[in-house]
């Protein structure tokens, strides 16, 4: 299966069933972490609020927002020159970029159209979630993190096979000072004690689920550009 990250609003007419979420859990292997999920209205509303607040903190924290905007590639020329980060393509993006309306600098300017639209874009995605799931580990060592990463891939491959769209939301799991209160809140909500050391449990991933049209593959560097040839 080809895994894709869905960065679009999900279909509001198609709920995600408990059977589907349970089937996702069954693909995990020992050591991948514990996967839990919610799809009821009350818990969905609570998690949407946490995610919206986390996104607001990121946008209102200059260093964090600057990092995101500088990793955004706008239009085919930028994407082809550096096929990584966050890609924005299509006729509308090209036109706004050419007109100077959508640029990395504008995305950093709270008074700009680009900043306002970026905020609305992510909030629409958050509000369209039909289920949320999270992956937690009992410790937070590098091994725990790597195993959880493998679990994440297994979850996404399984979701793809089921026709289910999945998108990670990492903002609430960031560890910079401005996010500290929300970091504690999301751990409290999920019943995982926020980590104080590598011995403590931690949320390793938070994801929204739903149904959407198939996503195109994200741009990637050719494999040969990432390989290092060892000296003979």
Where are these regions (language model features)?
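Acidic, surface-exposed loops and disordered segments
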Residues: 1-232
């Amino acid at each position: 299966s080809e895994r894709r990250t869905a960065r679009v609003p999900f279909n509001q007419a198609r709920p995600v069933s408990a059977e589907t979420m349970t089937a996702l859990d069954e693909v995990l292997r020992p050591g991948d972490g514990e996967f839990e999920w919610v799809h009821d209205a009350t818990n969905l509303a609570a998690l949407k609020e946490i995610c919206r607040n986390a996104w607001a903190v990121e946008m209102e924290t200059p260093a964090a927002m600057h990092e995101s905007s500088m990793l955004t590639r706008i239009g085919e020329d930028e994407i082809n020159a550096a096929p990584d980060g966050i890609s924005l393509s299509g006729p509308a993006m090209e036109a706004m970029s050419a007109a100077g309306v959508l640029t990395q600098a504008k995305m950093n300017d709270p008074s700009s159209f680009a900043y306002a639209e970026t905020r609305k874009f992510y909030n629409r995605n958050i509000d369209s979630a039909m289920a949320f799931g999270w992956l937690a580990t009992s410790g937070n060592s590098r091994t725990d993190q790597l195993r959880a990463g493998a679990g994440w891939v297994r979850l996404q491959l399984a979701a793809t096979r089921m026709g289910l769209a999945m998108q990670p939301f990492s903002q609430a799991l960031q560890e910079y000072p401005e996010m500290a209160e929300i970091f504690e809140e999301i751990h409290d909500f999920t019943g995982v004690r926020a980590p104080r050391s590598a011995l403590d449990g931690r949320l390793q991933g938070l994801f929204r689920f739903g149904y959407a049209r198939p996503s195109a593959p994200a741009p990637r560097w050719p494999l040969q550009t990432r390989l290092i040839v060892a000296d003979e």
